[in-house]
Amino acid sequence: MRALTLLALLALATLCITGQAGAKPSGAESSKGAAFVSKQEGSEVVKRPRRYLYQWLGAPAPYPDPLEPKREVCELNPDCDELADHIGFQEAYRRFYGPV
């Protein structure tokens, strides 16, 4: 009985392996880069207006961070960016560019 079960499992495994080897990929899978899209195409798919993002919660949309432009300036300077990783953005910006 044990040998019969083992033989049936081996036959099933052989059928599965040979069935997958002969299968051809579908048209969607065969085109190169189909799994990846550009950032612009991806953002168009999930684009939604920010002001309506939290309307269903009854809370207003969050305001943009006023320090974001300064954070970007600090990120463009490799020394400021590295220091910001260690001591924080505001202190690193103050040391390189003056008061925040």
Curated annotation (Swiss-Prot):
An annotated GO cellular component: cytoplasm
Cysteines joined through disulfide linkages: C74-C80
Posttranslational mods: Gamma-carboxyglutamate residues are formed by vitamin K dependent carboxylation by GGCX. These residues are essential for the binding of calcium. Decarboxylation promotes the hormone activity.
GO biological process: biomineral tissue development; bone development; brain development; cellular response to insulin stimulus; cognition; glucose homeostasis; learning or memory; negative regulation of bone development
Residue numbers bearing the 4-carboxyglutamate modification: E68, E72, E75
Binding-site residues, Ca(2+) 3: E75, D81
Protein task: The carboxylated form is one of the main organic components of the bone matrix, which constitutes 1-2% of the total bone protein: it acts as a negative regulator of bone formation and is required to limit bone formation without impairing bone resorption or mineralization. The carboxylated form binds strongly to apatite and calcium. The uncarboxylated form acts as a hormone secreted by osteoblasts, which regulates different cellular processes, such as energy metabolism, male fertility and brain development. Regulates of energy metabolism by acting as a hormone favoring pancreatic beta-cell proliferation, insulin secretion and sensitivity and energy expenditure.
Protein family per UniProt: Belongs to the osteocalcin/matrix Gla protein family.
Protein name as annotated: Osteocalcin
Organism annotation: Macaca nemestrina
Gene: BGLAP
